[in-house]
């Protein structure tokens, strides 16, 4: 199979916001307890955090982590999670029908984020609470000193403010499963007033308005237009959530699901711009795709979980090779929309539908989806270029034209990086033509290929991972490479001529 790309340095989508590679940790299952925090584990530091997990998270180059939920946040009293640990109450978590000990709270999570080099994206409870609790939390976290809440933070051991800059106005408030579920009109008014109060405390923060819980919601579209119309002037981002699965065990159909994500992003972008035009506003609302991933493997086992346990295993999907391929396609799709998608959170980070898994009495390990995400987060920084791609297509029941080649290019001062997925069951000879670009040569060609599509990683057996390929050549303004059957590929090239752009006269 043959495919071509034309990459021009002047055809740019936009700059990659590093927060595109964010993630999410919820007080749910073993994400926190036995995930990031396990004081009796051999690798635990003096604060009780697993250093093997810290090491794997740092490898992912994650800039920001959404916290503490998720459905959990709609019943969360943030005051329960501060002060002496011994005095913190145990609470029923109605979202996941477990018991929350509050042993890890705001201070502990902030300290863990310092270890992994990430900021917090804090969600506030707009299910059972509202304006007052939210503005008090901003004061507690961000106000320097001299008030009740800021001085309480200082007395709890944090002299300087946490300085949290990104805040979510609740979680999935359109969902009937949500504690405190609201209509679009109810939520829009509450979100507007909550954002207003929060920004009166700290006018440097940015806030995310809840969009639909997924594209299949019966209120999708109407919800977005209603809440945006109400809260537009007070908010900065609109959220999107979507998970994908291969319940039909149809690989071709499954690998096309990224086209659904592409359509979803385009639709929500259009809604934001519709309300902007209606209001004659100069303000642009960008997108926060703050829950996305693959989620379907664990559905049946979770139905059998007994209620009211502390940190039971929940949503511990074992990801396989085909999941890694789709995740690569989803990452490429997010990059294609880097002009409007400024935040995206892989949900979640540890144990719960996560790239990292832990053994209670053993080690932490990388799932198959870890590798595409890590490579994109490390190498996909800079400006996204919009290539012209020619590739054969196939059809599914949902999409008439699915390209066998899914690809995008990112450029920075030193490198041109091409991310590519071959969806096909034939090898692909890819020829990349360069316009206004000059290369010194290829730095590396990494590929994930040749695995059984159902192959998974296990503790001490991370066999589904990238390897180095020599099937690449760059010369005469072209890059030629062989993309193996069903493969995730990363081609890194060194730029010349002061960033690689040829001087134009």
Task: Set out the residue ranges of the language-model regions.
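Non-catalytic accessory regions flanking glycosidase/transglycosidase catalytic cores in CAZymes
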Residues: 1-223, 228-237, 261-262, 266-303, ...
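Active-site His/acidic residue clusters
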Residues: 241-257
